[in-house]
């Protein structure tokens, strides 16, 4: 049990140095302790879809939940609350008091590298999902840190870019999810973003931080993103409480100097220290484990499976191709994702999972009597797959000297694969600024032939196989996007190998500062990283031919492919919406021979181009599904779960159609949010542009009827008694299922341009076949309000408001109305 401390007593008695120490982290994950006054260190931990703990390298395995867009696609408050509880319990097992999540930035572009981390393109849906998962997490005693406040909606030059956005768009779109969280959840911490907003970094922008504390009357601990503090004086005076990580770069002795010059007041230091102590006092109540451990329990697996299955969106099901009958005799599974599931995106979302269920294993389990044919068809990886199951006796040795010198071994760590990130690794005597490491292990290939090897590095590295150099990624390097945007491109080498023969693999690695490559706008965590991958060299045309052959033979074909953490990750944005090279050709070739019995399962966190969509009878969007990816997909494909997911973002047919196409990267250090409030479906509806699949879309194996007239009461809007819209919904189909009713508001004509309609409520209802139920959706004052830039306030405009209830943004099934009798202005939440 952590000893208690009195905040006022501590502040009155600690030294100035102790106060200043509180204002920055002690190391990569912890706050400073003051043992004399029983002030403990508080442990923070990533990430958005699972709890990694304190180690990027050789971390303790963890539960991996579906990605943010997958959770958003459930449109299910209760499930998100349960997900939050699971994350909180995982934190406790890892000894962590504070979860660095959720992410609630906006997917203004389908190309954003971290788009998969956030819930939705709509601020209302994003805010409600965030509120639910936060309340679940904090019910365990763990503090949530909602992030990234605000405008970190793309990765390109994220530390340097100046986001130019109108006050109206800032308030109505980008701040709104945080505002909902402030109103409904009051999490204990808020993380600032790396970027600038309208000329000034958020972390040192008093106007932005005052919105939180003065406008919304929410007073969380405000911490920086990791290495996202850029000044001493401005950040402290603006309201940043905690610089992370430690050791400090801008506080400590620099605060002392600024105080001597009276650039920072003593009262400011005390105020910031008080907030840190309040955070520590609250966080220290969490009953965390003394050691980092796992907790892989059956009930957690069941929840993860439910989360995955309920997130899956049935995009297309012509002729009721799905569900596939379990009596099928022969089924073809095609795609590299079949045996290598994409469980998460990259960056802060990466972790070592307890396990990962592949679709192949799940189908074998679901169809014990069927003949299952498998072909990869085309590789979907960007970096060659890491070596793991064919690796044995692997360790990494650490030194302060390069391999050509006489050197002293400082540490040895066992490894289970050939990828490592050392940003938070340390060992006694190791010079973190400049060190070297040697990975050695035994590789036993399972197939004879020519093997491709790929080596990507943040630092420098060379690969030797049986002491023969195969790849040199040290002498000449080309910058790529790996490792948060700091790594090289993948350098490739080849070697002829024999199945069953054991080969000695050796990687000579130099830490980050051994590389001359530098980049603007990316986060330099230090330490370095490397990824060695390998696979049998294959002829792409022959791979497709093999896939076509099994598709032609089978009664049903499932093509499961898409993106993965190589393509969607923190640190870089996608250059286009395309699937990996060769995937579209594979799908088209399979459809040529088996279009009437083929289901396409796409795994990605954000939209991809589907030039073959008009030919496919069945299309399923499966996101990144976490530990239970294979089970979740199979449950839907074979009808054990009736799909109920709805798209949390619009799915454009072409990347050029999206509203940010001309403004999706830093140009001259700035990024113009030229679409203003017209993000996602707001844009497509305003300009009348068709999308491939609309926001809120998702099919079911059953059918529903909704009463065409919504009863809205009271008919006159009052903030003291806001209206509720009520409809009858009936399951008119053959099986139980869930329908999400989405409430959109169409504002009256105004001198201020408004979107055609905006989401302001939703509810998900589960009904047995033939069951009918009355369903109500509450309407709050946000539904009638827009940000008046002249008055600098919210404006609720008089007039008649249309209530449009739909099963997607384009399928409006019920209507009603209410009126606002008098225009009012307001602030706050």
From Swiss-Prot:
GO molecular function: beta-glucosidase activity
Glycosylation sites: 13, 304, 473, 602, 627, 664, 749
Chief subcellular location: secreted
SUPFAM superfamilies: (Trans)glycosidases (SSF51445), Anthrax protective antigen (SSF56988), Beta-D-glucan exohydrolase, C-terminal domain (SSF52279)
Catalytic residues, chain numbering: 225
Record GO cellular component, one term: extracellular region
InterPro entries (alphabetical): Cellulose_deg_GH3, Fn3-like, Glyco_hydro_3_C, Glyco_hydro_3_C_sf, Glyco_hydro_3_N, Glyco_hydro_3_N_sf, Glycoside_hydrolase_SF, Ig-like_fold
A single GO BP: cellulose catabolic process
Top-level enzyme category: hydrolase
PROSITE patterns the record matches: PA14
EC number: 3.2.1.21
Keywords: Carbohydrate metabolism, Cellulose degradation, Glycoprotein, Glycosidase, Hydrolase, Polysaccharide degradation, Secreted
Domain of life of the organism encoding this protein: Eukaryota
Domain PA14: 389-548
Reaction(s) the record says it catalyses: Hydrolysis of terminal, non-reducing beta-D-glucosyl residues with release of beta-D-glucose
Gene3D superfamilies in the cross-refs: Galactose-binding domain-like, Glycoside hydrolase family 3 C-terminal domain, Glycoside hydrolase, family 3, N-terminal domain, Immunoglobulins
Pathway(s) this gene product operates in, as recorded in its UniProt entry: Glycan metabolism; cellulose degradation
Recorded family membership: Belongs to the glycosyl hydrolase 3 family.
Function: Beta-glucosidases are one of a number of cellulolytic enzymes involved in the degradation of cellulosic biomass. Catalyzes the last step releasing glucose from the inhibitory cellobiose.
Protein name according to UniProt: Probable beta-glucosidase H
UniProt gene name: bglH
